[in-house]
A protein has these predicted regions:
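Helix-rich effector regions associated with P-loop NTPase G domains
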Residues: 16-17, 85-214
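Short, solvent-exposed amphipathic alpha-helical segments in soluble enzyme
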Residues: 8-9, 77, 121
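Canonical P-loop GTPase G-domain recognition
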Residues: 1-63, 182-185
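Conserved protein kinase catalytic core
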Residues: 1, 28, 80, 112-115
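Alpha-helical scaffold segments in soluble metabolic enzymes
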Residues: 31, 35, 71, 143, ...
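Glycine-rich phosphate-binding P-loop
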Residues: 58-78, 82, 107
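Solvent-exposed alpha-helices and their adjacent loops that cap or buttress functional pockets
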Residues: 52-54, 76, 97
């Protein structure tokens, strides 16, 4: 997406290598391997000249929680070697995974001690990097809808079969409209907004809305 391209430009402008991938797809792992070998071409050549061509390259996987670090390692290694799940905090400590050419160090996700930006805090909550049990799920879902419809209105409209008028409703009313369409009702015909909020967040994180970069 255009947002992803902006992130790539941002990192490359800072002279940092950047590859946009899916952690679940082998092609993404191969792209990272190629990027590592390109970055370390001089070192690998010196190793080869010194008779150390068989030495493995050590790679550390670090980042915020629940972004697919362990999933990526399993794809990179070609088998389920690191424990992975769709929630933050699964990786409790350092774990090494060895492949033919690489030794991969899987690290627990880390966050800032304090968020100076509400946008950063919201985006981390949207993708599940902050534990849901400390969040108000309805507020989370409303903020998510409001954010995504601003940059990806067509994806939200297509997923929940919304017309332009409904898509433009205030966030709470929009969530109610989606819940009504999905039949998430309680006795008396009112929308179960908590169930609807959970459904919205779960579907977003499962990529059922489509490819989205925040």
């Amino acid at each position: 997406s255009a947002v992803t391209e902006e992130w790539i430009k941002y990192f490359r402008a800072a002279d940092a290598g950047c590859v946009a991938i899916s952690a679940k797809q082998k092609g993404g792992a191969n792209a990272v391997k190629a990027a590592i070998e390109k970055e370390l071409a001089g070192l690998l050549e010196r190793r080869q000249n010194r008779g150390m061509g068989g030495a493995k390259t050590q790679v550390m996987l670090c980042g915020i929680p629940n972004v697919g670090k362990s999933t990526f390692i399993n794809t990179f290694a070609g088998s389920a070697r690191a424990k992975a799940a769709d929630r933050p905090g699964v990786t409790k400590g350092k774990q090494w995974v060895s492949t033919d050419k690489f030794d991969l160090l899987d690290m627990p996700g880390v966050l800032w001690k304090k968020f100076d930006s509400k946008t950063i805090a919201s985006n981390l909550a949207f993708i599940g990097s902050i534990k849901d049990d400390i969040l108000d799920v309805e507020e989370l879902a409303m903020n998510l809808l409001d954010e995504v419809r601003r940059n990806y209105p067509d994806l939200v409209a297509q997923r929940y079969k919304l017309d332009a008028e409904t898509l433009a409703l205030p966030p709470y009313e929009l969530m109610e409209a989606i819940g009504r369409k999905r039949g998430l009702l309680v006795r008396g015909g009112e929308v179960n907004t908590e169930r609807c909020a959970i459904m919205l967040v779960d579907e977003f994180r499962a990529c059922k809305w489509g490819r989205i970069s925040l």
